[in-house]
Amino acid sequence: MDLTNQKSWLQNNGEIYYGPVQISSGRPGQDTPKGTHYVNRKVKDEISYEFNNAPMPYSVYFTNNGIAFHQDDPYVPSAGCIHLYRADAQRYFNDLQIGDKVYVF
């Protein structure tokens, strides 16, 4: 995932097969963590109790502190998560599996 250009894509064996797609990442002070991470949890109908029960459909978590890909406006900065359009969030949710690598730069 390219935070500078706010783009993400899915790869298999080093080949891009979906994307790049528009994303929004964490706002200043709530930055999306860079580095190599791994998918550790998926929740289709997630709700954020930390942020006033905000809906987080198609959440794919890749850190141990609540950072995930999920559906939301990909032009509005987040509290650290990666916002995707609905169709992209659905695709990420369906394609990414527990243990898959997520590289953020």
Annotate each PLM feature.
Residues 1-27:
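Cell wall/extracellular polymer interaction/catalysis modules
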Residues 27-36, 40-105:
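Exported/periplasmic cell-wall-interacting domains
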